[in-house]
Amino acid sequence: MAARPSISVIIPTFNRARYLDLTLASYLGQSDRDFELVIVDDGSTDDTADVVATYRDQVRVACVHQANRGRSHARNTAIEHAQGDLLIFSDDDRIASRSFIAEHRAEHRADTPRVVLGWQEAILSIWMPDLMIAAGTIVELLARRPNLRGQLRDSVTALITPEMVRDELDATIADFSCPEPWQQKIAETIERYGLDLNGYCFPWRLGVTGNLSVPRQLVRDVGMFDVELRGWGLEDLDLHYRLHRAGAATRVSRTAINYHQFHERGPALMHDWNNNALRLIEKYAAVDLELYLRTMRGKLSLDEANRIALEHATLAAAGSSVAADYARLMHDHVHAMFLLVKTKQPG
């Protein structure tokens, strides 16, 4: 019997067979081979099962099929089936760098339990005419690979094949990768507070399950993913928030890199996000979380929110009634703000 793997890579998927094929190919050449892939097919109706089947003899992979129940359910199912003591959360559209597993493992050699946030870049793997991609990014890619110009047409075009990922991963990344918008958005915060995010009150806002690792027992201890958070957004922030409150440190790794494949996005994303934000407000009634959500509505800068959170924590630790009064006022204000948005949403 094969030894139990020490790392489980959690990948939920739903109707993303073409992207998943490239993602799985990137795990064939990992420098660290002591891992398994745990894929939960969340009710796909495309070729997902066939894609996974082609990798069964090439890499250790377990695939669980279930009716479509959403991201949180799918990840919880994967956690229940995982054998590794360390979980790496990734997505079906993330091409892993060759040292991806090894770099995540290295970050967990510290004595204290931690959440490790890997580094994210983007990659153009499949061209679609309606892709939301900056013109400057296209110009940069064409400068590196001029023959792309003839491939960016009015039809869907595969620019990267599984064979290219398997056999020429580094060259493929060099030709087709570009900065990831989310990573660019949070880069200033990481630069200011360092890789350990010392003095930053909202480290959990940076944790997305496209590239995050954490000991499996910690995830189980805090209750895994909240299945009441439905649709898109904030289920990963919610898990990281609970891990943070339970005492887990947060560490950013610049070297545990994966590459987010550009793809089309559905129209209901912000509708889902707002509904999930409202659930978190009602679930926690916590000043730090509500301050962060105010920044997302453009009502406060992150610097201002961080300063207020630090001051509030100091007052609360001293037992000040001002802290309690502020918490009540903040909760009522933010709850009303997001409830108003919900009432204006169609449907």
Predicted regions and their residues:
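Conserved short acidic donor-positioning loop in nucleotide-sugar-dependent glycosyltransferases
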Residues: N15, Y27, D42-G43, R69
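Short, acidic, metal-binding catalytic loop of nucleotide-sugar glycosyltransferases
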Residues: A25-D34
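A conserved acidic beta->alpha catalytic loop
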Residues: S26, D41-D50, D91-R94
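Glycine-rich, basic loop-to-helix element that forms the pyrophosphate-binding segment
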Residues: Q66-A82, E103
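Short aromatic/hydrophobic "clamp" motif used to bind/position activated sugar donors
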Residues: L87
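Conserved donor NDP-sugar-binding/catalytic core segment of glycosyltransferases
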Residues: S99-P181
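Active-site donor/metal-binding and catalytic loop motifs
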Residues: I123, R220-D221, R230, R245-M270, ...
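Acidic donor-binding loop at a coil-to-helix junction in glycosyltransferase catalytic cores
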Residues: G231-D238
